[in-house]
């Protein structure tokens, strides 16, 4: 099967879902189409995943996920409004209908899956990590006894700190913050020995906020790999399918080397 056939096998069902949803008056699609905008939950600034550039234009992996859905539903990648949300705010915002889709570096967990949201298709796999100043001489979890850790409340990393501390008998001291920005600023101001979050986000923070990125080390908090996965509300399975297959189309396009510059030539248009 050639790449055109494979890509068509992915994209054509999305078009079919859109037609079926129009006929069945599915709530989320109707709301988005009537509004003419897709409302997407975003981070409060994580370069590489979701952050505005110097001109205020949002960029990043999660941002492009939302734009792909906007193209599928509205035919316009810029018909998206991005709502910055903290770890505590993001899931309630989806549950209450404040947003239509939630990428925002969201880890797929059983507890979340059972609380009114459905996960679609992972768009990034990574581990949870610690970042610490190299000057402390710590390079692995087992050496962190008594360390203070900046952590954002409402995130899976809050649980990881407690689990790691118990498992290795480290007596870690969580310093909890309501939002990502406050946790990061506290870490770089020296209030905590370590900062915990997804490793990709740590690399982004180190590159964008550290005066000298080489002064900091990142290492795994656990041996497990997390699936960061955009989520939608439960009870709207066809909307979930549209989001899922929009992401699949992005993955397929990347594997075939299809870009905005060569898409017409690659598809023979």
Task: Map each language-model feature to its residues.
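Acidic, polar ligand-binding/catalytic clefts
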Residues: 67, 71, 75, 79-143, ...
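Sec-exported extracytoplasmic/periplasmic mature domains
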Residues: 33-34, 70-78, 95-99, 107, ...
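N-terminal signal peptide c-region/cleavage motif recognized by signal peptidases
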Residues: 15, 20-22
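Bilobed "Venus flytrap"/periplasmic-binding protein-like clamshell domains
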Residues: 39-48, 58-73, 107-108, 126-182
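Short helix-initiation/N-cap motifs at beta->coil->alpha
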Residues: 80-92, 174-189
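Extended ligand-binding regions for polar small-molecule ligands
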Residues: 64-67, 71-73, 135-137, 142, ...
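Bacterial N-terminal signal peptides that target proteins for export
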Residues: 1-14
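Extracytoplasmic small-molecule ligand-binding "clamshell" domains
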Residues: 25-103
């Amino acid at each position: 099967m050639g790449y055109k056939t494979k890509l068509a096998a992915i994209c054509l069902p999305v078009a079919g879902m859109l037609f079926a949803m129009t006929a069945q008056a599915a709530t989320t699609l109707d709301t988005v189409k009537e509004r003419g905008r897709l409302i997407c939950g975003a981070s409060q600034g994580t370069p590489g995943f979701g952050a505005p550039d110097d001109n205020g234009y949002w960029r990043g992996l999660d941002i492009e996920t939302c734009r792909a859905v906007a193209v599928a539903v509205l035919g316009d990648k810029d018909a998206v409004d991005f709502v910055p949300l903290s770890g505590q705010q993001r899931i309630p915002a989806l549950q209450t209908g404040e947003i239509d889709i939630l990428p925002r570096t969201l880890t797929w967990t059983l507890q979340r899956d059972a609380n009114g949201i459905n996960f679609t298709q992972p768009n990034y796999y990574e581990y949870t990590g610690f970042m610490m100043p190299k000057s402390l001489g710590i390079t692995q979890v087992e050496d962190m006894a008594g360390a203070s850790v900046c952590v954002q409340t409402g995130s899976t990393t809050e649980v990881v700190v407690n689990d790691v501390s118990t498992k290795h008998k480290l007596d870690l001291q969580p310093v909890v913050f309501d939002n990502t920005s406050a946790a990061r600023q506290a870490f770089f101001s020296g209030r905590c020995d370590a900062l915990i979050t997804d490793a990709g986000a740590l690399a982004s923070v180190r590159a964008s906020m550290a005066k000298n990125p080489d002064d900091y080390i990142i290492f795994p908090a656990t041996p497990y790999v997390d699936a960061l996965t955009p989520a939608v509300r439960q009870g709207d399975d066809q909307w979930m399918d549209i989001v899922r297959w929009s992401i699949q189309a992005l993955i397929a396009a990347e594997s075939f080397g299809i870009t905005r510059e060569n898409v017409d030539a690659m598809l023979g248009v």
